[in-house]
């Protein structure tokens, strides 16, 4: 089981954590949402819970709850700039289909 980050994603997360002034790492999860069923959740975590799995890649700790891990195993988190837009992009090998707007997915 693994979650990885691109160099640009790791750099951006480290900038956010430094600006925030505290934090253990980044929580990655999924929630029920959208027309395809699931959406990604990204948030800072100050203290992982006992049932969490913690991955570390490029100096960034990524925390995933047990329920989300089955849907996220093998995912790479990237940070991309496309024109004037920038943001995190998920490359998840478990995704079978995405909605047209790209906001939700199905595994």
Curated annotation (Swiss-Prot):
One Pfam family matching this protein: Fe-S_biosyn
Statement: the UniProt record of this protein carries the keyword Iron: yes
Entry keyword set: Iron, Metal-binding
Residues passing through the membrane, by range: none
Cofactor binding notes: Binds 2 iron ions per dimer. The dimer may bind additional iron ions.
GO biological process, one term: iron-sulfur cluster assembly
UniProt entry tagged with the keyword Iron: yes
Family: Belongs to the HesB/IscA family.
General function of this protein: Is able to transfer iron-sulfur clusters to apo-ferredoxin. Multiple cycles of [2Fe2S] cluster formation and transfer are observed, suggesting that IscA acts catalytically. Recruits intracellular free iron so as to provide iron for the assembly of transient iron-sulfur cluster in IscU in the presence of IscS, L-cysteine and the thioredoxin reductase system TrxA/TrxB.
Assembly and oligomerization: Homodimer; may form tetramers and higher multimers.
Stated name of the protein: Iron-binding protein IscA
Organism: Salmonella newport (strain SL254)
């Amino acid at each position: 089981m693994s979650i990885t980050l691109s160099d640009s994603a790791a750099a951006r997360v480290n900038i956010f954590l430094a600006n925030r002034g505290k934090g253990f790492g980044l929580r990655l999860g999924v929630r029920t949402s959208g027309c395809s069923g699931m959406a990604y959740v990204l948030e800072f975590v100050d203290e992982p819970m006992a049932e969490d799995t913690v991955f570390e890649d490029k100096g960034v700790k990524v925390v995933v709850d047990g329920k989300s891990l089955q849907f996220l195993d093998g995912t790479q988190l990237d940070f991309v700039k496309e024109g004037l837009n920038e943001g995190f992009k998920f490359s998840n090998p478990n995704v079978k289909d995405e909605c047209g707007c790209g906001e939700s997915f199905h595994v």
